[in-house]
Amino acid sequence: MEKIKTKDPRFMIRFATSEDAGLVLEYMRKLGTYQKMLDKITATEEGIYKLLSENKGEVIFGDYDGETVAFIYFFNNSSAFIGQTGIYIDGFFVEENMRFKGLGKIMMAFMSKLAIERGCKRVEWGCLDWNESSVRFYKNIGAVGVDTMTIY
């Protein structure tokens, strides 16, 4: 598996394969715990394996000094509203001890670049309203929230 260099020589990005399904599930559970929603994570390793092997979802991992410390789960979407494709980030997590080192910013910059390379016009994700530190992070990288709708 190819490791993609970043501006931090100790931090590399790599795409997951279906064989990484267990690690993806582990990170989804970490995210669920952080979001106080672990009981909502009902995915199984087999389900994640299927999503990855059928190219219905993708994952990038962030490895720091060879150890996985971050992940993003995403998939392609489209909008009749703008008549364009995009990328939707369904899960994003950086290990707590690795936050505030610029790694999340590197991961999101990679996602923006990937979207452009794939001809997508936007990258979207959700963020829980109570998660003020994440809201600050997203605003700091230039993201603009949509506060005129509720997702059901």
Predicted regions, residues:
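Acetyl-CoA-dependent GNAT
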Residues: 11, 15-21, 26-84, 114
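Hydrophobic adenine-recognition pocket in adenosine-nucleotide-binding enzymes
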Residues: 16, 92-94, 127
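Short hydrophobic/aromatic beta-strand or adjacent loop that forms the aromatic wall/cage
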Residues: 57, 147-151
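Conserved acetyl-CoA binding element of GNAT-fold acetyltransferases
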Residues: 84-96
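Conserved acetyl-CoA-binding loop-helix of GNAT-fold acetyltransferases
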Residues: 94, 100-113, 140
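Conserved active-site alpha-helix within GNAT-family acetyltransferase domains
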Residues: 105, 129-148
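Conserved GNAT acetyl-CoA-binding A-motif
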Residues: 116-126
